[in-house]
């Protein structure tokens, strides 16, 4: 057998064209400097709006405090009236309960002073129901 002639593939005359191997990505978005400028601008605007809101909130808070200060004498007068009414009712109840005890002075202070001493919760609500005493000492805490 004779050796067969092998035909080898050869490039075309003049060679192959150049091969494009680089990535051809389109330019997307803003540049880094413009994004930095937008970020700084957003931060400055955010700080400005927070400062503006804090000033408004402080103004509203001062207004609330002034309203509370204006209403405080009225609220204190109501509390004093309620306290004196309860003390008067307690004295009447004490007179009824202790009428048979000799040498008992109704309304005698346990403190040896002539100054006004605000009554304790136990003094005010000693002759009241347990619910009233708990409500006075703890308020609305059991709702939360």
Swiss-Prot record:
One of its GO terms (cellular component) is cytoplasm. It comes from Gorilla gorilla gorilla (Western lowland gorilla). Belongs to the complex I NDUFA13 subunit family. Complex I is composed of 45 different subunits. Interacts with CARD15, but not with CARD4. Interacts with STAT3, but not with STAT1, STAT2 and STAT5A. Interacts with OLFM4. Accessory subunit of the mitochondrial membrane respiratory chain NADH dehydrogenase (Complex I), that is believed not to be involved in catalysis. Complex I functions in the transfer of electrons from NADH to the respiratory chain. The immediate electron acceptor for the enzyme is believed to be ubiquinone. Involved in the interferon/all-trans-retinoic acid (IFN/RA) induced cell death. This apoptotic activity is inhibited by interaction with viral IRF1. Prevents the transactivation of STAT3 target genes. It is found in: Mitochondrion inner membrane; Nucleus. It is a single-pass membrane protein. InterPro entries: GRIM-19. Its main location: mitochondrion. Keywords: Electron transport, Membrane, Mitochondrion, Mitochondrion inner membrane, Nucleus, Respiratory chain, Transmembrane, Transmembrane helix, Transport. One of its GO terms (biological process) is negative regulation of DNA-templated transcription. The keyword Electron transport applies. The lineage of its organism: Eukaryota, Metazoa, Chordata, Craniata, Vertebrata. The chain crosses the membrane at residues 30-51. This is NADH dehydrogenase [ubiquinone] 1 alpha subcomplex subunit 13.
């Amino acid at each position: 057998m004779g050796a067969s002639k092998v035909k080898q593939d050869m490039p075309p005359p003049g060679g192959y064209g150049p091969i494009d191997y680089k990535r051809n990505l389109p330019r997307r978005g803003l540049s880094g400097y413009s994004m930095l400028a937008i970020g700084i601008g957003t931060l400055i605007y955010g700080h400005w709006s927070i400062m503006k809101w804090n000033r408004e909130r402080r103004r509203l808070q001062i207004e609330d405090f002034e309203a509370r200060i204006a209403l405080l004498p009225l609220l204190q007068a109501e509390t004093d009236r309620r306290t004196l009414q309860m003390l008067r009712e307690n004295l009447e109840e004490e007179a009824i309960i202790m009428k048979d005890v000799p040498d008992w002075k109704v309304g005698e202070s346990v403190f040896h002073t002539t100054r006004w001493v605000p009554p304790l919760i136990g003094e005010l609500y000693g002759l009241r129901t347990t619910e009233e005493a708990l409500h006075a000492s703890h308020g609305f805490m059991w709702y939360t």
